[in-house]
Amino acid sequence: MTDHSHLAAVRDSYDTVATTYAVRVPRPSELDPLNRAMLAGFAELVRAGGNSRVADLGCGPGLVTAHLASLGLDAFGIDLSPSMVGIAREGHPGLRFAEGSMTALDVADDELGGILAWYSTHHTPPEELPRVFAEFHRTLAPGGHVLLGGYIGEDEHLSPAEAYGHPVSYRSYFLPLDRLAELLRGAGLVVAARLEQAASGRAKRPDVCIVARKPERP
């Protein structure tokens, strides 16, 4: 897929599944204890840095955005899908949500204290991830943190015909943990912590959380 076509496939697919997805996706309180702890730890790191402005990239219906706000962060959400953004705005009228792509964020240089990419980068072709992570580096303030959560695999990709009972056209890519960490480092970020969990229960494949930060200026 070209850059344009993969973004269109993700946007159109999530527009199609948005209503069902918003009902079925786990609430933050339903996440496993370690993932909840990673979100809480991320929020604490961001608050300690003195810049609480956080972008939740691929925010979907805004559930995790609202959770970050409840943890004391100035959180806002960005999603490719207009339908997802509409659901997020309706469900969380006190928060800001906007349409956009993590490949070209409408955010100023050094603006953010934190970036959350919570199970939202796996539809990005591997060759596009350096561009995405470069945007993370550009928009983070020095000392700011990224929390990336997602599924991993051995350079696998899937092209499902349907999801959540609806037809979809996106692809999902599952990279090894070490490669994700290497790509983050390649964008100029420092990997500070990694959590890997085996497939179990609702998670049908291994998943990871990676905390990275933008170095302070010398």
Placement of each model-derived feature along the sequence:
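Class I SAM-dependent methyltransferase SAM/SAH-binding core
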Residues: 53-57, 61-104
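A short acidic, Gly/Pro-enriched loop at the edge of an enzyme's catalytic core
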Residues: 103-115
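Conserved beta-strand signature within the Rossmann-like core of class I S-adenosyl-L-methionine
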Residues: 144-150
